[in-house]
Amino acid sequence: MTEFIPAGTLYHALPSPFPMKRGGVLHQARVAYETWGTLAADRSNAILIVTGLSPNAHAAANQANPEPGWWEAMLGPGKPIDTARWFVVCVNSLGSCKGSTGPASVNPDTGAPYRLSFPDLSIEDVADAAADVVHALGIAQLACLIGNSMGGMTALALLLRHPGIARSHINISGSAQALPFSIAIRSLQREAIRLDPHWNGGHYDDVRYPESGMRMARKLGVITYRSALEWDGRFGRVRLDSEQAADDPFGLEFQVESYLEGHARRFVRFFDPNCYLYLSRSMDWFDLAEYVEERPVAGSAIDNARADARPASAKPQTGVSTADTVLAGLARIRIARALAIGANTDILFPVQQQEQIADGLRAGGADAQFIGLDSPQGHDAFLVDFARFGPAVSDFLQDC
């Protein structure tokens, strides 16, 4: 069980006990975060970034850690998210292995890693933990809440469960619910990990580690993070040189196979498998349509107590999830301005889901805009296609 924490990481201690949406509590839990820029005296210039499944809080270089971050081209002085103007906070998701408390963390009640004793994790838990960081920094209202990929889900949950926490919102390649295709892919990824004998019911170590399962899970993910258009343009049917090809008659032969293998091997030892399982499943469970019907969902006493403390519009409900109920759930969110952006080639979070977000927020009274970008790079476009995503984000923030 390993955590992978960047230098310069800051920590916020969550209330103890910290109740989880689906039952159970965390004791002495923490959230990892980093900051950029200077908070204005009136605390009106704060932006919060909530991330996808795998990133840490190190979105860009800063004084505490000058190493480039995972969103380096988007965040910094003079960049689309201009830290000469904005005070930016990026949090690592609760449940991760990159600083925030998760299955790889030590359970203070036992002195051993949580592993599978970690409570069921929901996107709402990730959102509530992020909101607690915002409040601890003395920020009453964010100028903008930015969420990408899984972070788009987290952002919507945050806005719904913590009304008034942000004046504006940018949702990048996110969604208001998990679609069947995405659920199916993630279920296969989790199955690949759990079928690796070294996973051993979550009890692995650095010597006996489910590397094969993690490698297969990552390959499946990478295939969905990009598009067929990009695969064709980058690799075609080009074969490896004879000295690069595997001797195994069913081994690596094409360049695209080699790319997937290399990408997977670079990932598998830098993300904890149990954390991967928990975060992956939290996305499958997320559905804003739960917040629409009138009859509350049955839950634990802790869950119900926490839900009772929130506005009625922010309590999960029962009912069949349809396009109409998702839109109705989105319409419960109160935000002044919003931008939903996606790539037209995204198969994991299809661009129609970002359009749905804009439609739903608009129904709730927001000045909401949708932009579908013609990027060939699929779901991961927001991480690489800065020529398209950068101006869209920059233009929106100009008026915040």
From Swiss-Prot:
Q: Which of UniProt's keywords are assigned here?
A: Acyltransferase, Amino-acid biosynthesis, Cysteine biosynthesis, Cytoplasm, Transferase
- Keyword Acyltransferase in annotation: yes
Location in the cell reads: Cytoplasm
Q: In which pathway does it act?
A: Amino-acid biosynthesis; L-cysteine biosynthesis; L-cysteine from L-serine: step 1/2
Pfam families in the cross-refs: Abhydrolase_1
The main enzyme category here is transferase
- Which Gene3D superfamilies does this one have? alpha/beta hydrolase
Q: What is its EC number?
A: 2.3.1.-
The UniProt function text for this chain reads: Transfers a succinyl group from succinyl-CoA to L-serine, forming succinyl-L-serine.
* Protein name (record): Serine O-succinyltransferase
Originating organism: Xanthomonas axonopodis pv. citri (strain 306)
Taxonomic lineage of the native organism: Bacteria, Pseudomonadati, Pseudomonadota, Gammaproteobacteria, Lysobacterales
